[in-house]
């Protein structure tokens, strides 16, 4: 049976979940936790490593590590890892590719569908850049959903939310704050009004 993959690449941590039929499971990306740090480290040989290992290596060579690069999404100024310039989109693509590879290896093949969450206040420009990052990661067919919408879907998986019910979502992440009001429609949600967000307000 095929499966779907959802990815939340946050400012500080990245998480993933898989869905098969009516069953949804958190996918353990790290060795000791479900999430991994959204951190990229450039090795001396030019390869990048991601997550917990990158975090440890960055303590030894802090000039070769990138953290919180989601906040730089759409910024034309490159992020320097050592002497190598990287865009935030390229770093995000590296994390997405790692997640996709781990999930595909453990599930015996690639997912049938992929959804990637993004902050509610991202406009068409940043969503297009996210699409480009997904393409670089081999996820060109991914669907993009706002983080409040993804949170509402997760909530509805465990609580009764009837057709037409309205929910308010307040999402305080590591680097961004989003708020949105959504109405249950069929198997999903529609956003009412304009979602609001503060891009540099979070838990870090």
Residue ranges and their predicted role:
Residues 1-71, 80-81, 85, 105-204:
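Oxyanion-binding/catalytic loops of NTP- or PPi-dependent enzymes
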Residues 80-101:
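Adenine-nucleotide phosphate-binding core of ATP-dependent small-molecule kinases
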Residues 70, 74, 96-104:
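Amphipathic, well-packed alpha-helical segments that form the structural scaffold of globular domains
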């Amino acid at each position: 049976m095929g499966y779907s993959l959802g990815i939340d690449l946050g400012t500080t941590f990245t998480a993933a979940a898989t869905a098969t039929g009516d069953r949804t499971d958190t996918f353990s990306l790290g060795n000791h936790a479900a999430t991994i740090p959204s951190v990229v480290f450039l090795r001396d040989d030019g390869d990048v490593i991601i997550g917990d290992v990158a975090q440890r290596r960055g303590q030894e060579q802090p000039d070769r590590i990138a953290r919180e690069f989601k906040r730089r999404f759409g910024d034309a100024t490159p992020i320097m890892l050592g002497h190598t310039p990287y865009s935030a989109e390229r770093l995000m693509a590296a994390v997405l590719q790692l997640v996709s590879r781990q999930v595909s290896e453990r599930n015996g093949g690639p997912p049938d569908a992929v959804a990637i969450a993004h902050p509610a206040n991202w406009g068409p420009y940043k969503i297009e850049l996210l699409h480009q990052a997904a393409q670089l990661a081999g996820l060109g067919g991914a669907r993009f959903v706002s983080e409040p919408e993804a949170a509402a879907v997760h909530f509805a998986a465990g609580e009764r939310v009837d057709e037409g019910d309205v929910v308010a979502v307040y999402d305080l992440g590591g680097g961004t704050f989003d708020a949105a009001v959504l109405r249950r429609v069929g198997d999903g949600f529609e956003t009412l009004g304009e979602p609001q967000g503060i891009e540099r307000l979070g838990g870090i």
